[in-house]
């Protein structure tokens, strides 16, 4: 087993993962929650913007709006994390025995 070659391959894989992670963290994803809320979220999970359709804003029922916003943000975070995992997993070669 050539440990030097293995170390070089691991370093290359680490650099590739690091580059993809950095690119992903800066990427902005758009999520439309049931047509009511549009969320722009970066890969690092920073919310860039939240747009709410006026028809769901009822001053006498703020609880419903809060529930919709919470669900929309949670879904955006969940989908962004799944996207990140898919990208990272596609970068790691299968059968390496490391992951």
From Swiss-Prot:
InterPro entries: YbaB-like_sf (IPR036894), YbaB/EbfC (IPR004401). It is found in: Cytoplasm, Nucleoid. This is Nucleoid-associated protein UUR10_0100. The keyword Cell wall biogenesis/degradation does not apply. Homodimer. The lineage of its organism: Bacteria, Bacillati, Mycoplasmatota, Mycoplasmoidales, Mycoplasmoidaceae. Belongs to the YbaB/EbfC family. Binds to DNA and alters its conformation. May be involved in regulation of gene expression, nucleoid organization and DNA protection. Keywords: Cytoplasm, DNA-binding. Pfam families: YbaB_DNA_bd. GO terms for molecular function: DNA binding.
């Amino acid at each position: 087993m050539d440990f030097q070659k293995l170390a070089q391959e691991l370093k290359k894989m680490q650099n590739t993962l690091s580059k993809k992670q950095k690119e992903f963290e800066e990427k902005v994803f758009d999520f439309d929650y049931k047509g009511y809320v549009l969320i722009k979220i970066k890969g690092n999970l920073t919310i860039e913007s939240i747009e709410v359709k006026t028809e769901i804003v009822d001053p006498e029922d703020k609880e419903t709006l809060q529930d919709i916003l919470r669900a929309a943000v949670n879904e955006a975070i969940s989908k962004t994390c799944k996207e990140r995992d898919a990208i990272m997993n596609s970068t790691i070669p299968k059968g390496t025995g490391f992951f």
